[in-house]
Amino acid sequence: MRWSLCCHINVRIAYTICGIIIGLFWACVYIFAWKNWVALAACLTATAFAFETFYFYLSVKRDTILNWKSQTFQVLFWINLIVGFLSIGGMITAIVLAATKHQGVSNKDQHGLNWWSTATWFLVMLKWTWQNAFIARYYGKLLTKSIIHPEEPDDPSTWKF
């Protein structure tokens, strides 16, 4: 049995859909209940990268991901890696701002601008972007390998018993 990145592709798709739903739910909370626009922006950006992950997994399930161009994987890898590093910087900045402004995490403290929520969504963004970078790198290498060394036809004389 071959080891996979996590588990069956349907489980990965379901996990990603849950992440998208949670992101959209919290976006509604930030809009209608807490009016935290900075956390909303970070939340929606992280959710957009979750949609990218969903598209990756859907392409894997449909077996169309290796039809993509090699440059597509390189561009996606670098964009996701750079945004991941930026989200680390955003998370550290948000934590420092939350600590220096003595913000809390209670329901009452969440109304208006709260940097703890923003830091959390920068962490979520880091998860999705680096996961996407890993997937893009993996399938980019797989595509390059399949172009350079196409699969040989199965020759019974080479079988080992």
UniProtKB/Swiss-Prot annotation:
It is a multi-pass membrane protein. One of its GO terms (molecular function) is heme binding. It is found in: Membrane. The chain crosses the membrane at residues 13-33, 38-58, 75-95, 115-135. One of its GO terms (cellular component) is lysosomal membrane. One of its GO terms (biological process) is heme transport. InterPro entries: HRG. Keywords: Membrane, Transmembrane, Transmembrane helix, Transport. Belongs to the HRG family. Heme transporter. PANTHER family: HEME TRANSPORTER HRG-6 (PTHR31525:SF2), HEME TRANSPORTER HRG1 (PTHR31525). This is Heme transporter hrg-6.
